[in-house]
Amino acid sequence: MTLIVGLGNPTSKYENTRHNIGFMLIDALKNSNFTDVSSSKFQGELFKYSNLLLLKPTTFMNLSGNSVKAVNDFYKPERIIVIHDDLDLPFGAMKFKKGGSSGGHNGIRSIDTLIGNDYERVRIGIGRSGNAANFVLGEFSPEEKEHLAEILEYGTQAVNELIKSDIESVAQKFTIKKGVL
């Protein structure tokens, strides 16, 4: 079984913010084949199809590890893939890696604290401007919004390939270093 986690913050207040690009990609991956298997014990929205789980933690970003640990403990997936925003990559850049440090990302830090860092990551660049907290919790600019659909489509292709392949192959094929703006 593979668990794919998209990081973000719950509630409509944060729905269209940069920090929620992980949630957005989970929504793009989810189709009518998936069944909602959410439960309060998982602290998140959880969808299942065959041997694939999609998770959107509803704990707020800094406590994402609680949700990931609950699902991990219950389903015991062989593989975990976490999708998250990255301030240190230009907007629209995409990188893939296994393990490593949190890079200052509090959602990743929370997961690392509770289950370790032996999982794959899809890092989607959101760029950086001004105060980091205000920036990640801000909505995409009109110019960024013009590119969001293509970034999510590309991310969907990459994650669908990753499900069938290994992180190194996907990194070679799908890494974008420069972003779109």
Curated annotation (Swiss-Prot):
Protein name as annotated: Peptidyl-tRNA hydrolase
Gene of this entry: pth
Pfam family, one: Pept_tRNA_hydro
E.C. designation(s): 3.1.1.29
NCBIfam families cross-referenced by the UniProt entry: pth
One Gene Ontology term of the molecular function aspect: tRNA binding
Family designation: Belongs to the PTH family.
Biological role: Hydrolyzes ribosome-free peptidyl-tRNAs (with 1 or more amino acids incorporated), which drop off the ribosome during protein synthesis, or as a result of ribosome stalling. Catalyzes the release of premature peptidyl moieties from peptidyl-tRNA molecules trapped in stalled 50S ribosomal subunits, and thus maintains levels of free tRNAs and 50S ribosomes.
Origin species: Campylobacter curvus (strain 525.92)
One GO CC term, this protein: cytoplasm
Enzyme class, spelled out: hydrolase
Keywords: Cytoplasm, Hydrolase, RNA-binding, tRNA-binding
Positions bearing the site annotation: Discriminates between blocked and unblocked aminoacyl-tRNA: 9
Gene3D superfamilies in the cross-refs: Peptidyl-tRNA hydrolase
Binding site for tRNA: 14, 60, 62, 106
Catalytic activity: an N-acyl-L-alpha-aminoacyl-tRNA + H2O = an N-acyl-L-amino acid + a tRNA + H(+)
Active site, UniProt feature: 19
